[in-house]
Amino acid sequence: MIHHTINFDTLTIRDCLETFELLKKELIVVIKKAPTNPLGFHRLVSGMSQIANWAQCIWDTEGNYTGVPKEPLDPWSTDRVLVQRVTAKEKDDKPTGIFPKGKLDWHSNLNGPDRADGVGLQGYAGVEDTVTSWLDTAAAYDAMPQSLKDKIRYKYCSYTYNMARWADTPWHQDQRWKSLVNKMERKDDIYRMWIEQENIAGVKGLYFYTNNDLKIWDDDIGLYEELKEFLFQEKFIYHHEWDVGDIVLSDQLLTLHRRPLRPDAVFEKRILHRLTFPISNTSEPKFIIEKNKSCYSKKELEIFWK
């Protein structure tokens, strides 16, 4: 994790690209108390990469539902953007954000090697005295004993996307988001990835997403528990205590994040804005797909990764 300073009043593409290079190497970049006008956040992310979840930016900053955009909006050529909100706040008895309350355990946006492998969160309102935690697998890999590295080398996991294991989502929000989720999901939610990973900047770490259903192929007895016990140590975890305006950017290939359980009233006041974007997957063919192709047979590649 590294702290970074940006002047959003004079933000340039060069500032964005410098931040992007920092993110590739450090995996977690924290910008404290940035302006809460989402225009700056959107310009930063679009200047670094491209906004992947533009079709899920369906609210204005007051929580009014605006409908699903038909095309992405260039934040550099407008003075107003729509947002994706993370909040339990309701308006007219309707949800105004995703992941509203309850459990949000260790997870990543990278639910498959084709996905956007970057996430940005900004504290918009009511975030004081709340925490989000990030697990840095590169730090864990650096500290890993050679004996464990030898056990995970050439091992891959088969994953099945299972949001119910890591998030509590009320049924009414599930229904509201069903059409959007279907547009964003792959036809088949089963995917494979090597445990050892390396991002586009050459940073080595792990992809070990324990809260999706997973099977380690050719597993040695006890490897799952041994790796999980080593990985989720406090010394590899960064706890971010939110202030209004804070932006946290993170690499989703080599980190996981979670929020602790809090009373519903806390999340009914708390509003985060969320953007997803590619980091290693900015290239074509996508970098992470190419790195994990050898987990698949030729026939499977023809089906999944055309």
Protein language model annotation of sequence segments:
Residues 2-246, 253-306:
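Non-heme Fe(II) oxygenase catalytic core, chiefly the N-lobe of the double-stranded beta-helix
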